[in-house]
């Protein structure tokens, strides 16, 4: 019987709704991953409601919790680390120490960094020190980096004028160390207004994926967290880059279709769970010239 992969997911959590680990853990489990959730913040709900309660995990608790896992002899069984929303740069540095420790215990372990830098207009606030940490430190350690367009622009200190520019910008990040860059949401001049586009760039390959853009009165939160978790999970169960990319695009769209059909603001993960594991749809990733 094949071994079930184990993944340490270090990101935010909400008690109500779906963002951070609350958006990613259950879908990753439905893919067949044993997920170890470690919550960098625990809030009552996501911040786009405009009000919330909760607290940030003290940075020293991150290595302390990992010490506990090591103490029972399980650290070497960790196959991957996923990091997302950070409450502070100190948390980020603690995570990089954990990644180094896990890679020492299991040299084949992967690290995917979802570099959440915030979007004040949408109510997502991230301290400037966190953005600096992601730009200057985390990108050099990550095996996979999964920015959205705003985060890609920040990494490259420029904005694209075309899809070709987006490819060039993502490719420039490979020089910092990652194996591949997944741009979870593209936005550039000339992009079709009725499509949602994603980009995956590796050393000698690039793929572009388009799917229909679904309309919502208020855009659901947690879609990027869901995408990052699904992409890493599919790599862990044996997909190559292109198949993991296509699966991610399809499964996320299935969740959004269910969410739209229900008229929900929060992602309908439970109702869509079978379609997450086995998407009915497929969106072909088009190979791009490098």
From Swiss-Prot:
The keyword Nucleotide-binding is annotated on this UniProt entry: yes
One matching Pfam family: Phos_pyr_kin
E.C. number(s) listed in UniProt: 2.7.1.35
Alphabetically ordered keywords of this record: ATP-binding, Kinase, Magnesium, Nucleotide-binding, Transferase
Gene3D superfamilies: 3.40.1190.20
Pathway this chain belongs to: Cofactor metabolism; pyridoxal 5'-phosphate salvage; pyridoxal 5'-phosphate from pyridoxal: step 1/1
Residues that bind substrate: 12, 47-48, 225
GO biological process: pyridoxal 5'-phosphate salvage
InterPro entries (UniProt xref): PM/HMP-P_kinase-1, PyrdxlKinase, Pyridoxal_kinase_PdxY, Ribokinase-like
GO molecular function: ATP binding; magnesium ion binding; pyridoxal kinase activity
Binding sites annotated in the UniProt record for ATP: 114, 151, 184, 211-214
Catalytic activity, reaction form: pyridoxal + ATP = pyridoxal 5'-phosphate + ADP + H(+)
Cofactor(s) required, per the database record: Mg(2+)
One Gene Ontology CC term in the entry: cytosol
Function as written in the Swiss-Prot or TrEMBL entry: Pyridoxal kinase involved in the salvage pathway of pyridoxal 5'-phosphate (PLP). Catalyzes the phosphorylation of pyridoxal to PLP.
Family note: Belongs to the pyridoxine kinase family. PdxY subfamily.
Complexes and interactors: Homodimer.
NCBIfam families linked to this entry: PRK05756.1, pyridox_kin
Protein name: Pyridoxal kinase PdxY
Annotated organism of origin: Pseudomonas aeruginosa (strain LESB58)
């Amino acid at each position: 019987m094949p071994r079930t992969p184990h993944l340490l997911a270090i990101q935010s959590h909400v008690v109500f709704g779906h963002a951070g680990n609350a958006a990613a853990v259950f879908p990753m489990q439905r893919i067949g991953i044993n997920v170890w959730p470690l919550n960098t913040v625990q809030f009552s709900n996501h911040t786009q409601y405009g009000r919330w309660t909760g607290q940030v995990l003290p940075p020293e608790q991150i290595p302390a919790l990992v010490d506990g896992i090591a103490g029972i002899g399980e650290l070497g069984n960790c196959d991957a680390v996923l990091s997302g929303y950070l409450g502070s740069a100190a948390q980020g540095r603690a995570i990089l120490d954990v990644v180094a420790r896990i890679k020492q215990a299991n040299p084949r372990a992967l690290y995917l960094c979802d570099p959440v830098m915030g979007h004040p207009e949408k109510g997502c606030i991230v301290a400037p020190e966190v953005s600096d940490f992601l730009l200057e430190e985390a990108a050099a350690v990550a095996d996979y980096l999964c920015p959205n367009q705003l985060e890609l622009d920040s990494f490259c200190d420029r904005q694209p004028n075309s899809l070709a520019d987006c490819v060039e910008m993502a490719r420039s990040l490979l020089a910092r160390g990652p194996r591949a860059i997944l741009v979870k949401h593209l936005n550039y001049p000339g992009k079709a207004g009725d499509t949602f586009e994603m980009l995956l760039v590796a050393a000698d390959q690039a793929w572009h994926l388009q799917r229909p853009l679904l309309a919502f009165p208020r855009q659901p939160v947690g879609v990027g967290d869901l995408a990052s978790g699904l992409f890493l999970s599919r790599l862990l169960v044996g997909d190559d880059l292109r198949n993991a990319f296509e699966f991610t695009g399809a499964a996320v769209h299935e969740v959004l279709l269910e969410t739209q059909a229900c008229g929900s603001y929060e992602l309908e993960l439970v109702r869509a769970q079978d379609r997450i594991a086995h998407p009915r749809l497929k969106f072909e990733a088009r190979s791009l010239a490098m």
